[in-house]
Amino acid sequence: MKKVEILKTSRPSSAGGAARPSTASPTHGAPKIAIKTRPVADDVAPTAATVIEPSQKAMKESVRFLTDFGEISDAISDLLTSSPNFNVISAIGPQGAGKSTLLSMLAGNNSRQMYREYVFRPVSREANEQSRHQTIQIDIYIVNHQIFLDCQPMYSFSIMEGLPKVRGGRFDDSTAMSDTLRLTAFLLYVSHTVLVVSETHYDKVIIDTLRVAEQIRPYLAIFRPKLAIDRKTNLVFIKTKASSIDLAPTVIREREELLRLSFQDSRWLKVSQEPFKTLIVLEEIRVRREHLFEEGDEPDEAASLNEFDEQIAELREELQKNREDFTVETAAMDEKKWLDMCREVIRDKTLHKTLKEYQRAMTDGVRTHFDNGFHAERDANKFFS
């Protein structure tokens, strides 16, 4: 048993022309959770049951998890411990949906902080309007044995521009789809929970992509500890920039039922059957103004921010549940072994072979490409049958 103390740190007050507090720490002003091991009596000798949580290096901001060559960065191993009590949370979605912002909040930031203080730097409004993206491949941030993975946007025009093109200067749609499937399939395999972040409650293009990506799996039969082949990844859908109608309980229930129907026959993906656990509706966070730190928030603004932070805290607690073990044996996988598994997935020949066959099928015209995205479900059953 461990004693958990929640320590809340208040922001220092500014007086006169005092400068703002330093923003070196991204979690400044956010709740901090310190897990302390129960003290052992002096006359009791240490036993195998006395567990000391491994220490973890503090990160100030997210770093690249995957390099431009698709390999895992070597420095990541120094950030992980041998603790088996860890949680991997990923976020996918289109450009500008709020993936980086949401992960930053879950990692410890709060709604009153400036964007430059977020551990995952979000795309600026100007860059988003110009269809430019911020995250490249996958970024990672680790805190309190929580591993957060932020994926580059799906179907981003700026990403497609950097991909190989066919003759005539036209976009190679099959390559773009293959790149999206590669990252999505990887995150589905190595994550406990994947957050599907979108401005719409039901993005069919994303759902179709998920149904195809779940079938693109590596073959890691000789990996040790032995992996659980029937493990399911938990999906949580996040509706961002919600309007008043989106917040109605009856509307949320109806939309959750639609999402459950979309994954009722899934073998490796699951959604919660409890109400208000499948679809989380969040209102937009406006850009924080500098004077809010010094003059205080307006009453309505403060109430809205407090409500948002409480909702994030509830989601953070909920994400600790419904975690299925990666391995057959309970708690056999620790953080460092998880990283070894990630490397094996990246290098797995079966996964790459499936992706190449899928890309070849798309190039030959088996797949259908729509102007507003990619339709992935109808022909997937033909391809994988």
UniProtKB/Swiss-Prot annotation:
Annotated spans, Disordered: 1-32
InterPro entries from the UniProt entry: P-loop_NTPase, SMG9
Keyword Transmembrane attributed: no
Swiss-Prot/TrEMBL keywords: Nonsense-mediated mRNA decay
Molecular functions per Gene Ontology: molecular sequestering activity
Membrane is among the record's keywords: no
Disrupted-gene phenotype: Defects in nonsense-mediated decay (NMD).
GO BP: nuclear-transcribed mRNA catabolic process, nonsense-mediated decay
Family, per entry: Belongs to the SMG9 family.
Function: Involved in nonsense-mediated decay (NMD) of mRNAs containing premature stop codons. Probable component of kinase complex containing smg-1 and recruited to stalled ribosomes.
Name of this protein: Nonsense-mediated mRNA decay factor SMG9
